[in-house]
């Protein structure tokens, strides 16, 4: 197979940041994706419908003339999120989900949830409104090994949450473990999972062996090879509730290449090429169209994009960096050649 045509894809987990960085990276994502679930972890976080509306307008204002890219907005769940705000979000027409960051789990998560029991009424309202909860599934705390955070979260937080809220739709985002992969490919119709290109392609050796590679560093951190294999099997299985979510997370080069580097891999401009590489390695290229273009809309109750794109087997030279406003952004696989690229008519 030398070409693959699929519905124009959506990204169900995307960071666009704000300010000059957003002005630079939003057009790069819009060139690849039709829609994207936009993460709310700004400073300050997007916690109200009013803030989400303003952020949406800033994103739309950063797009080139004629762009049809649609930002699907989210709210940042806090201990104080009210049921009334959830009702307003569901009625807005542009807020499509609420994001759970456990406090301290990742970039700009300090305002995150400290105890889900404090969010009981908001989560109950989400059940009533059919608004999905998107989860950064890591437990935090000094006693937890960083490589065990996801499995601890599933056992100690996620399962009790699902039991307490039997009608709540949940997306376990950026699944990184075999335990998580098994969970989201189970029989629970409320539960879906997104998979990033880096977690399908790489393990923790790729991050650490032969020198620390800051542009492979993300949260949740890359795991064991056995986990990567389980993720790839799940993502390429054809299961209807697994779909594309890059977690593309731009940081200025200096914030990554430092003594205390930020977590996040920048992949949006090359994401489809990376996913094609992973799916081809699994012998499942024919399943990429559902993963990238159909499963996500089905879970969110949205139409599949009528436009199509075509991947072709031809070298794609990844640039050393992309424009990032005040400072360049270095992508994953910078300076390397990928085997698949989007066909440019």
UniProtKB/Swiss-Prot annotation:
Per the record's keyword annotation, is Hydrolase included, yes or no?
yes
Q: Which cofactor does it need?
A: Zn(2+)
The entry marks the following residues as binding substrate, namely: 15-17, 41, 136, 251, 263
**Could you give one GO CC term from the UniProt record?**
cytosol
The reaction(s) annotated as catalysed by this protein in its Swiss-Prot or TrEMBL entry are: (S)-dihydroorotate + H2O = N-carbamoyl-L-aspartate + H(+)
PROSITE patterns (UniProt xref): DIHYDROOROTASE_1, DIHYDROOROTASE_2
Matching entries from InterPro entries are given as: Amidohydro-rel, DHOdimr, Dihydroorotase_CS, Metal_Hydrolase
Pathway assignment: Pyrimidine metabolism; UMP biosynthesis via de novo pathway; (S)-dihydroorotate from bicarbonate: step 3/3
Tell me which residues this entry annotates as catalytic.
Answer: 247
Task: Spell out which residues are annotated as carrying N6-carboxylysine.
Answer: 99
Enzyme Commission identifier(s): 3.5.2.3
Gene Ontology molecular function, alphabetical: dihydroorotase activity; zinc ion binding
- Keywords assigned: Hydrolase, Metal-binding, Pyrimidine biosynthesis, Zinc
Q: What are its GO biological-process terms?
A: 'de novo' pyrimidine nucleobase biosynthetic process; 'de novo' UMP biosynthetic process
Source organism, top-level taxon: Bacteria
The record's comment on cofactor binding reads: Binds 2 Zn(2+) ions per subunit.
What is known about its subunit structure?
Homodimer.
Family named by the database record: Belongs to the metallo-dependent hydrolases superfamily. DHOase family. Class II DHOase subfamily.
What's the protein name? Dihydroorotase
Species in which this protein is naturally found = Halorhodospira halophila (strain DSM 244 / SL1) (Ectothiorhodospira halophila (strain DSM 244 / SL1))
Q: What is the lineage of its organism?
A: Bacteria, Pseudomonadati, Pseudomonadota, Gammaproteobacteria, Chromatiales
């Amino acid at each position: 197979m030398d070409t693959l045509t699929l519905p124009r894809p959506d990204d169900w987990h995307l960071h666009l940041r704000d300010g000059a960085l957003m002005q630079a990276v939003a057009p790069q994502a819009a060139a690849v994706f039709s829609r994207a679930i936009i993460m709310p972890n700004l400073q300050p976080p997007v916690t109200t419908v009013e803030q989400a509306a303003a952020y949406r307008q800033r994103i739309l204002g950063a797009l080139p003339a004629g762009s049809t890219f649609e930002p699907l907005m989210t709210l940042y769940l806090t201990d104080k999120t009210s049921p009334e705000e959830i009702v307003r979000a569901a009625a807005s027409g542009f807020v499509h989900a609420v994001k759970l960051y456990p406090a301290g789990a990742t970039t700009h998560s300090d305002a995150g949830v400290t105890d889900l029991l404090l969010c009981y009424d908001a989560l109950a309202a989400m059940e009533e409104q059919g608004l999905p909860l998107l989860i950064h599934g890591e437990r935090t705390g000094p006693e937890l090994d960083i490589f065990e955070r996801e499995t601890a979260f599933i056992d100690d937080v996620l399962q009790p949450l699902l039991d307490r809220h039997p009608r709540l739709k949940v997306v376990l985002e950026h699944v990184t473990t075999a335990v998580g992969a098994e969970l989201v490919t189970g029989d629970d119709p409320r539960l879906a999972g997104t998979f990033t290109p880096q977690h399908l392609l790489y393990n923790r050796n790729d991050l650490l062996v032969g020198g620390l590679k800051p542009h492979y560093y993300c949260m949740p951190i890359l795991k064991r090879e056995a986990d990567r294999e389980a993720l790839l099997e799940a993502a390429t299985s054809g299961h209807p509730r697994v779909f594309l979510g890059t977690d593309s997370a731009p940081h200025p080069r200096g914030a990554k290449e430092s003594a205390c580097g930020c977590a996040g891999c920048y992949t949006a401009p090359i994401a489809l090429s990376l996913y094609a590489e992973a799916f081809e390695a699994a012998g499942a290229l024919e399943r990429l169209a559902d993963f990238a273009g159909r499963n996500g809309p089905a879970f969110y109750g949205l139409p599949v994009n009528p436009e199509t794109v075509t991947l072709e087997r031809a070298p794609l030279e990844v640039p050393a960096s992309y424009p990032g406003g005040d400072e360049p952004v270095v992508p994953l696989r910078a300076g390397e050649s990928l085997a698949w690229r989007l066909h440019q008519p």
